[in-house]
Amino acid sequence: MTNHSVILCILDGWGNNKNSQFNAIAQADTPYWDSIISQYPQSNIVTHGPDVGLPDRQIGNSEVGHISLGSGRIVLQDLCRINEEIKNIRKNTHLLEFTEQIKRNNGICHIAGLLSDGGIHSSLSHMLDIIDALSYLKIQVVIHIFLDGRDTPPISALKYINILCSHIKDLNNVSIATISGRYYSMDRDNRLDRTTKAYNSIAFGDGKRYEEPISAVQDNYNAGITDEFIIPCVIGNYQGMNPTDGFIMTNFRSDRVIQILKMITEDQNTNHITLKNTIGMIKYSNELNIPCLFPNKKISNTLGEIISNQQLHQLRIAETEKYAHVTFFFNGGREEVFENEERIIIPSPSVTTYDLVPEMSAYEITDTLIKKINLQKYSLIIINYANADMVGHTGNIEATKKAITTLDQCLGKILKCIHNTNYILVITADHGNAEEMFDVQNNMPYTAHTLNPVPFVVCNYPKKIKLKNGRLSDVAPTILEILNIKQPEEMTGISLIDTSN
């Protein structure tokens, strides 16, 4: 081992794009970043498709990105894994046990999930396959649609609703019950007023009522409300849940289903309806004691575990929006804290959308980081700056430019702090976003992640090095080489430090 310590700085949503048009990063005022890329070794990292365990051309996301960064290997992601396993869904023992209980209770099945082909939180085909299986098993099904508009174009819901309606039109035991924008049904930032609106529509049939789903979406469009923000509403004569019913969540990503599922499964008050017979696609969290259709596989010997096994101290810092990513996901889906691992969560601003406060909590994260650096205690510090991603998702390029300038100032403060210390600053991202802000083909803001590579930069290294291009799973092995810690065989990534010369 050496005396080096490493700060892994994850600029969430910061991609490389040679085209400066509609590129918030290229257009922002970034003197410190310009200095960094002019004087420190750098390379490009791939964040999508098979390089991160996803299908070809499937864009990456924060969950996949942090799993890849922390595990140091290509992990077959839930999307790909479930794509294979769902082919035998009618024989899935977990589904059969779930439906047997519904039959015994003479109940119906509620299916909820993000109706999207974005591939980040869900797959439309998964929902359709499960609907078919339940119909085959002669279970009455009602569907609660969560609309996207974030990992898909902002006004694209009618496309997916038409696909769903066409699929179920000949299924007499299947109907659409509610519609909600993901802003309400998939909040992860403890804004429970949003989650409650979605819950009330599902549990009690509360909300504006429409005869059919197309008119519900069109009515919101006419009011200037796009997919993500569509207010929870009710379709047809849907009256709500009964305690004898069952509930399936078809999202395969955990962070944005926990709040709504806790409301559905846990007693809140005397007027609250809960469904004990609830099942998810994967094990979402230890907080949720519900079974799953496709159990996860354990990931061992992650970067965090290796640092802990070396009896070294490590620190994770992020604001609320990305806290799970630098902890749970970075540790390979492990919620328990490793020995000598510390975690600090900085509250995200309480605003409707982050273009209203593009600085988010970046300055607070930086101030906290600098205090911790000065302790000279930690061998590894992992921080996540959410700005480029979360502000980029709003599609507001001017606000995103302000977010990028904020990050630039934070990087300048970090570099000044680590000067003449043993800290080496490793800068990268989990995926792109802010570097591509407009969809020219569809003539609308582009709010999703991108297929662009992300930067990989090593700052303050004591000797001159060159870096190779690679993938996200190569970051952990590179950090281990810097720390002079042996890479375990489970890590199949390679160090990006070029030793060919």
Swiss-Prot record:
Active site feature: 62
UniProt-annotated binding residues for Mn(2+) 2: 12, 62, 430-431
Lineage of the organism: Bacteria, Pseudomonadati, Pseudomonadota, Alphaproteobacteria, Rickettsiales
Pathway: Carbohydrate degradation; glycolysis; pyruvate from D-glyceraldehyde 3-phosphate: step 3/5
Stored Pfam families: iPGM_N, Metalloenzyme
Gene: gpmI
Subunit structure: Monomer.
EC number: 5.4.2.12
PANTHER family for this protein: 2,3-BISPHOSPHOGLYCERATE-INDEPENDENT PHOSPHOGLYCERATE MUTASE (PTHR31637:SF0)
Chain residues that bind substrate: 121, 150-151, 182, 188, 253-256, 322
List of residues binding Mn(2+) 1: 389, 393, 449
UniProt keyword list: Glycolysis, Isomerase, Manganese, Metal-binding
Binding note for cofactor: Binds 2 manganese ions per subunit.
GO molecular function: manganese ion binding; phosphoglycerate mutase activity
Full protein name: 2,3-bisphosphoglycerate-independent phosphoglycerate mutase
Sequence similarity: Belongs to the BPG-independent phosphoglycerate mutase family.
Cofactor(s) this protein cannot do without: Mn(2+)
Function: Catalyzes the interconversion of 2-phosphoglycerate and 3-phosphoglycerate.
Signal sequence residues: none
Catalytic activity reported: (2R)-2-phosphoglycerate = (2R)-3-phosphoglycerate
Keyword Nucleus: no
GO biological process, one term: glucose catabolic process
A cellular component annotation (GO) from this entry: cytosol
